[in-house]
Regions:
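Glycine-/small-residue-enriched capping loops at alpha/beta junctions
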Residues: 1-110
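Phosphate/ribose-phosphate-bearing ligand recognition and processing surfaces
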Residues: 85-190
Length: 190
């Protein structure tokens, strides 16, 4: 059975099968978590990302692609491009954000990743309101789990929050669900 946990950590320090990067469409590395992941993974990551872009073009918002994790303790990085708040309407942005989580879980399933750690997609420089993003993230993960066989699903999913505000908001969403409403939820402290 899969567990969903919220933790407050630096995603680049986690020893998991896959970490999910909040990437830009060119996979170039940027600010926030994207920049930290690129810096931690080393120069080989930029070469892998450039090869993906050369072959497939820019990554669409809501899609996901996979690379090795380079020098990070994870095995893989799943790069997903979140919506930039204000570029689309709220409904479309919410659907795209949900698609990020589902696409990343599809990629994790294809990798047979047993543990996956998500950054809080689009809540940094892309400006998606944290109070809207957290319920979308949790809902997307839960609906993906409901639609897939246990053999396809990771056994551990971590919603990783770098800042206290995201941690509190996401923990509150998971606490409201609780184990009585979904078999997957387990919240953790810092």
């Amino acid at each position: 059975m899969t567990s969903i946990s919220v933790i407050k950590k630096d995603i680049t320090s986690l020893t998991v099968d896959a970490i999910v990067n909040a990437a830009n469409s060119g996979l170039r590395g940027g600010g926030g978590v994207d920049g930290a992941i690129h810096a931690g993974a080393g120069p080989g990551l930029m070469n892998e990302c450039a090869a993906i872009i050369e072959k497939n073009g820019l990554c669409a918002t809501g899609s996901a692609v996979t690379t090795s994790a380079g020098d990070l303790p994870a095995k893989w990085i799943i790069h997903t491009v979140g919506p930039i708040w204000g570029e689309e309407g709220e409904e479309r942005s919410s659907l795209l954000l949900s698609s990020c989580y589902k696409s990343a879980l599809d990629a994790a399933s294809n990798l047979r990743a047993d543990s996956v750690a998500f950054s809080a997609i689009s809540t940094g420089v892309y400006g998606f309101p944290k109070k809207l993003a957290a319920p979308i993230a949790v809902s997307a993960v839960c609906s993906w789990l409901e639609a897939h066989q246990r053999a396809e699903a990771p056994s551990s999913i971590f919603l990783v929050c770098f800042d206290e505000e995201n941690f509190r908001i996401t923990k509150a969403v998971l606490d409201r669900l609780g184990p009585n409403n979904t078999p997957w939820v387990r919240t953790e402290g810092q």
